[in-house]
């Protein structure tokens, strides 16, 4: 009789949803939602009768609208699969128990909030304020765009972006756009003009691409708004309610008197540039350090406080172990949490700037 356990007939329990599958599911949902948000208005044809509102896709040709609702869902799907690839890479690592329990749940939620609010980064007042301007400004802009799209889907009786609500809406949108764009300009100046040591030693070409795309998002947004207001004014539409757009409205006065056709073409050009910039943002999000927007808060949530920060794991007894290699030479030598750490790194250079080995001039770097 065999003394080995026979596991061949062991019942298989319910399959758990893996992290990479969750990424694909979220991306698929967002892609389908975006696609349907383009189809639904074509079927319902619900429009607002209020004179104080904004017509979505005003002056944008149908083929460009079709391209918008085709490319954006495709990019959302693409991004979700690229994130899934990163998560599957984490699964190549060895086990590392990071289970959430009743004992550590409250502490982990506090750590997660600290990651979302960038509490650690705010210790550096300049860098913290700069990143906050970009991060929270972008989130508000995303919320503004989402609110406009939701209003676009609703019947007349439920639409909410009109009257005083719309005035407040454009005020918040311009304020968020100004804060976001100013933050990006500050980041460019800090990285390529002021160039503090810890940033200078970590700058890579992808940083220029990221900042360029983000700057184009901000500038093109104001450009599209500027010419949308100017075009409508030239067409005889009363746009006094757009005075609450304290950036776009004054800019529109700079092109007062231009030919209506020129204003229309400029509006379309800036609108297309804005959408292309956002598509580029979706393209680089999962494949550059921008992914730390998602991975850093997750990493802080999963950090281990049971061991002192930086403490090394004990090595096995070298005379008794059967290991053929020590340390890490291939991906599989790391834990899945260590692989998540690498995808959460923002390449800020703080660890390098305080590393005593690096300070001696030796080619050693914790990053």
Functional labels for PLM-detected ranges:
Residues 320-337, 359-360:
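Membrane-proximal linker segments that couple transmembrane helices to downstream signaling/catalytic modules
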